[in-house]
Amino acid sequence: MGDDSLYLGGEWQFNHFSKLTSSRPDAAFAEIQRTSLPEKSPLSSETRVDLCDDLAPVARQLAPREKLPLSSRRPAAVGAGLQNMGNTCYENASLQCLTYTLPLANYMLSREHSQTCQRPKCCMLCTMQAHITWALHSPGHVIQPSQALAAGFHRGKQEDVHEFLMFTVDAMKKACLPGHKQVDHHSKDTTLIHQIFGGCWRSQIKCLHCHGISDTFDPYLDIALDIQAAQSVKQALEQLVKPEELNGENAYHCGLCLQRAPASNTLTLHTSAKVLILVLKRFSDVAGNKLAKNVQYPECLDMQPYMSQQNTGPLVYVLYAVLVHAGWSCHDGYYFSYVKAQEGQWYKMDDAEVTVCSITSVLSQQAYVLFYIQKSEWERHSESVSRGREPRALGAEDTDRPATQGELKRDHPCLQVPELDEHLVERATEESTLDHWKFPQEQNKMKPEFNVRKVEGTLPPNVLVIHQSKYKCGMKNHHPEQQSSLLNLSSMNSTDQESMNTGTLASLQGRTRRSKGKNKHSKRSLLVCQ
């Protein structure tokens, strides 16, 4: 297969892919040394990433914020179907959504990570790079995902698609970190994965007695929406950012006026993610029963009304993938997904079956997870294809056989050959398991009332609290660390200085803000929470 045959363009109309060819990665690994991948291209212009730039301490940049790599050329048609290896529909549905996440796919096709990866053990970024490249270069075929993708997670039974999705995203984020060096959590939030999927919540508490204000910032990789009383995603978002009144037993103990007074708590998005993962909370935490109701979601979503800063223009996101669960509880049923290929056509991805469908069909599903991308990001990454190569008609040579992992591995030194595939799975299992991943997630689990709304007890006045991401990239002895914090507030009396088991404090020297009402304290402190 020539280099040109890997890049498909123009209009490719078809109604259904059945199992034309089934390729197994362990067999394909033996051939890994032939066809080259797309050439690396210059990095494209602006990207929008501004996670707490004015608040966070200086951190080591693990990925340049303004330089997300773009592949100069990539397939424009839909890629391969995925073989179900037994209760792996949740894995297949998640992988298809990630494969059609343009910033991630273009980064994988640029080969930037695999060319510099020095991890001695299994690397999720390298494994995902091989999978995404293989899937996109195998249109009309069915491929078998590598066992290493779910090693440590799959236990031979149906799993939750959202858990596997975030397990994979977290593993990729971990792979961005230098394994042999200690990295502070501020630097962890500069990884490429966080730049794509990450944003930051802002919870602002205003004392209605003295008008003192305290802000809490909490990073996120996905947003969970309560749909009990919502008929649409917009309603769920409106409920999420609706100001909450704190009074009576829930009155706020203000650190400025030192009174237990009524207050308002407003939750907004301080920074927006390039790719927005919205999780509709359909399953109960205990019994796993499903809330089977229709919740409307738009093809285009303006997130500006939910942002902290309201003086800018629309912030438009476009839908590009939908995860659907069919069944009555999280313990049964199956998962499938809908994805939008780069030319704009929607496809239903149901394991091995790839079916063309309309946007009307996509918007009529009982969605579980929704994937939105900033419109500007979609256009920027889509344009990288047309700049790289002119579209051409589909030729017979393109449908003879799929591109195998063997052909695609020449520039993937981190991947293993077939005889070492079992070791690859074993190493992946040793590095991260579902139970190890779930432990810190349970400690930081989003409760129905959303823990980003949780009011910190007796916060000092004008404190900025920044929580560490709940998606931790490592654990010591598999237990969450509890660290004490020291408050250095020159404006407070020693009797007001309390020890808080919430994290490590980093003060903002010289940072001031305009006082409101009786608030005459000009210095603010930054409380960074584990």
Curated annotation (Swiss-Prot):
Gene3D superfamilies linked to this entry: Cysteine proteinases
Molecular-function GO terms, alphabetical: cysteine-type deubiquitinase activity
Segments of skewed composition (Polar residues): 495-510
Keyword hit for S-adenosyl-L-methionine: no
Keywords, in A-Z order: Endoplasmic reticulum, Nucleus
A Pfam short name: UCH
Subcellular localization(s) per the UniProt record: Nucleus; Endoplasmic reticulum
This protein's GO CC annotations: cytosol; endoplasmic reticulum; nucleus
Top-level taxonomic group: Eukaryota
Domain USP: 80-375
Basic residues bias: start-end ranges: 511-524
Residue numbers spanned by region Disordered: 382-410, 493-530
InterPro entries registered for this protein in UniProt: Papain-like_cys_pep_sf, Peptidase_C19, Peptidase_C19_UCH, USP_dom
Bias type Basic and acidic residues, positions: 382-392
Xref: SUPFAM superfamilies: Cysteine proteinases
Signal peptide annotation: none
GO biological process: protein deubiquitination; regulation of apoptotic process; regulation of protein stability
Family to which the UniProt record says this protein belongs: Belongs to the peptidase C19 family. USP17 subfamily.
Name recorded for this polypeptide: Inactive ubiquitin carboxyl-terminal hydrolase 17-like protein 4
Annotated organism of origin: Homo sapiens (Human)
Gene from which this protein is expressed: USP17L4
